[in-house]
Design a protein with these regions (language model features):
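Enzymes that bind and transform nitrogen-containing heteroaromatic metabolites
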Residues: 2-198
Length: 198
């Protein structure tokens, strides 16, 4: 086998998975833009951290990146218009999607493919709805509402539910997990019917 053939044989599909916990009204943050204590849940956090630890790349908005310390040293891609294109920094890759398209980022950052975790926020979630999620792990805190808060997707501000947005993006609910029944938190995993890397 040629060297090129050996390299191609090791390449994996790019699998993109979103992760979020929302209130009953599909908000991911309060009016101040921050995650309130009412959306913090230990079981959800443990699930989320296991998922990040098993990912090859984690895509954050710059605010989320700053608020969530990278204690494991995960490979991060920070979405920001503060950079000219795609830059390697001490704390990870920084990417301006206005200047460089996703396929070029993948070629540079994940040349052998792999699992991509997308924890948001809203602008990043909206962008990956267009790029294409393979799965979305949507936790919900029942009994919690955040009037005036930030929605998980901008389309929710126009009257669509998070589920309707995911369905329009080609995903379907495939599994429901009772993460923490005592505190009213469950998760629905949405998946694309035909899986495939980009």
């Amino acid at each position: 086998m040629s060297m090129l053939g050996a390299s191609e044989a090791k390449k994996r599909p790019i699998e993109i998975s979103g992760y979020a916990i929302v209130a009953e009204d599909d908000k991911i943050a309060g009016a101040d833009g921050l995650l309130p204590p009412s959306l913090r849940n230990d079981k959800d956090w443990e699930y989320y951290q296991r998922a990040l630890a098993g990912s090859d790349l984690i895509v954050f908005g710059h605010v989320s990146h700053e608020l969530e310390p990278n204690e494991r040293g995960d490979q991060r891609l920070v979405v920001s218009r503060r950079v000219a294109g795609l830059e390697r920094r001490a704390d990870g890759w920084w990417w301006n999607p206005v200047r460089i398209m996703w396929p070029a980022v993948v070629e540079q950052v994940l040349p052998l493919g792999g699992a991509v975790a997308v924890p948001g926020g809203q602008g990043v979630f909206d962008m990956f709805l267009q790029i294409g999620f393979d799965a979305f792990h949507l936790s919900r805190a029942h009994g919690v509402k955040l009037p005036g808060g930030r929605s998980i997707f901008s389309a929710c501000d126009r009257g669509l539910s998070a589920g309707e947005v995911l369905a329009e993006a080609g995903l379907s609910p495939s599994e429901k997990i009772a993460l923490d029944p005592e505190h009213g938190v469950d998760m629905v995993i949405w998946r694309r019917a035909i899986r495939g890397g980009r």
